[in-house]
């Protein structure tokens, strides 16, 4: 599972969505995952829950923040390699590799 902690007013989130997420090789990696986009800055109670979860579990409140979970709901990786397509692609590939490694146990 790929979790995207994002915000309505997050300029860097929009940059990633336009410049990186739209690349064919990134979309191919996303096709192998369940994607969840969690908005943390809306004025509703659900966003507050997402923001609290991000801070308590990952000790950060920054956006964008990306996490890949394994089948046991444990974080496999959260270091995205920055906003560079090659680094982000490596992050996704590593998460998929770790997922299948955990799944085969």
Tell what function each PLM region has.
Residues 1, 5-12, 62:
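Short pre-active-site segment immediately N-terminal to redox-active cysteine/selenocysteine motifs
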Residues 6-8, 15-49:
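Thiol-based oxidoreductase modules, predominantly thioredoxin-like and allied folds used
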Residues 11-14, 67:
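Cys/His/Pro-rich metal-binding microdomains
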Residues 19-21, 25, 57-104:
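Non-catalytic, surface beta->alpha helical segment in thiol-disulfide oxidoreductase systems
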